[in-house]
Amino acid sequence: MTEYFWAFTRAFIVTVIFMPAVIKFLKQSKEQAVIRKLGPDHQSKAGTPSMGGALFIAAASLSALIGSVAYSGKIGFVMVLIPILAVVAYAIIGGIDDALKMIHHADDGFRFIPKLLAQTLCAVVIMIIMWIMQIPLILNIPFIGVFNLGIFYFIFLWFWLVGWSNATNLTDGLDGLLTGTSLIVYLVYTWIALGVHNHIIVIFNASIIGALVGFLLFNKPKAKIFMGDTGSLALGAGLAIESIVLGIPFSLLWFGLIFVIETLSVVIQTIGYHFWKKRIFPMAPIHHSFEKFGWNEWQIDALFWIVTAIIGIIGILYMS
């Protein structure tokens, strides 16, 4: 229990201490200025620095590594390697994407195909490490059964990592929205990991949560800094990989329901406009529709956080 506390504290302190310096550095660099063109109120956010995810992901990863090694030595190092690799790899992809946006002063950084190839490469590396570590490549499908997919497990792993990293990326459209919702989902999986005595995942999650709590102090409305794709892609990849490690990947469809809804709203909006030239929602992702209805960011954040918390509690009670 002590190591859980220190994992949280280390990540929190590092994030809180160094974030002001990061914000100052990014503001002084004209290349780092970000102008969001999405959302009804995007103009008021012009000039807010991005890539805050780089610091809190680094803080969380370092804290998780220290905590895991302190808890169980080499075994802890090996066990925490996969979740750390997942968040760091996708943070790097997001970081390149953010950097390209800033350099070109555009909404799009990585083009679709190169970005997908980079995400696929990361999934391949993670899959190889899982195979080397002899992690069972089985898929537990609720109400159906357990299947040993063998090499075909890669297809599922690829889909899960790419899908969830992009789902959280779509959710990161308002100050504090993704920070708060993902924090709650990580809390839920921390509770589950405690129940199955997976102490390394608990340490990893405690580190992520500590970093997110620290980041939220700067990311709450009105945000002083955004996490950027650096943070949003990494958070989704982290949730995807730990749901797999815990052996309950499909639970994320419930606990991460907000991310699913955000993604579906974009898909539905795109299909509706493509086939019928009509917008199904006032704006997508769906959190922007609430802005169109006159809600402020705090109200939308509160709604999404509360819904995520209720979903988490219901899920935990059901699994108990």
UniProtKB/Swiss-Prot annotation:
Enzyme Commission number(s) of this protein = 2.7.8.13
What reaction gets catalysed by this protein? UDP-N-acetyl-alpha-D-muramoyl-L-alanyl-gamma-D-glutamyl-L-lysyl-D-alanyl-D-alanine + di-trans,octa-cis-undecaprenyl phosphate = Mur2Ac(oyl-L-Ala-gamma-D-Glu-L-Lys-D-Ala-D-Ala)-di-trans,octa-cis-undecaprenyl diphosphate + UMP
Protein location:
Cell membrane
Give the similarity note. Answer: Belongs to the glycosyltransferase 4 family. MraY subfamily.
Q: What is the membrane topology noted in the UniProt record heading this document? A: Multi-pass membrane protein
Extract the CDD domains matched here: GT_MraY
* GO molecular-function terms, A-Z: metal ion binding; phospho-N-acetylmuramoyl-pentapeptide-transferase activity
Any idea what job this protein has?
Catalyzes the initial step of the lipid cycle reactions in the biosynthesis of the cell wall peptidoglycan: transfers peptidoglycan precursor phospho-MurNAc-pentapeptide from UDP-MurNAc-pentapeptide onto the lipid carrier undecaprenyl phosphate, yielding undecaprenyl-pyrophosphoryl-MurNAc-pentapeptide, known as lipid I.
Please name the PANTHER family in this protein's record: PHOSPHO-N-ACETYLMURAMOYL-PENTAPEPTIDE-TRANSFERASE, PHOSPHO-N-ACETYLMURAMOYL-PENTAPEPTIDE-TRANSFERASE HOMOLOG
Cofactor(s) for this protein?
Mg(2+)
Q: Which UniProt keywords apply?
A: Cell cycle, Cell division, Cell membrane, Cell shape, Cell wall biogenesis/degradation, Magnesium, Membrane, Metal-binding, Peptidoglycan synthesis, Transferase, Transmembrane, Transmembrane helix
Q: Which InterPro entries match?
A: Glycosyl_transferase_4, PNAcMuramoyl-5peptid_Trfase, PNAcMuramoyl-5peptid_Trfase_CS
Q: Which gene encodes it?
A: mraY
Q: Where are the transmembrane segments?
A: 5-25, 51-71, 75-95, 121-141, 143-163, 176-196, 198-218, 241-261, 300-320
What are the BP-aspect GO terms? cell division; cell wall organization; peptidoglycan biosynthetic process; regulation of cell shape
Named in its record, the pathway it takes part in is: Cell wall biogenesis; peptidoglycan biosynthesis
Example of a GO cellular component annotation carried by this entry:
plasma membrane
Q: Name one Pfam family in it.
A: Glycos_transf_4
> What is the protein name for this chain?
Phospho-N-acetylmuramoyl-pentapeptide-transferase
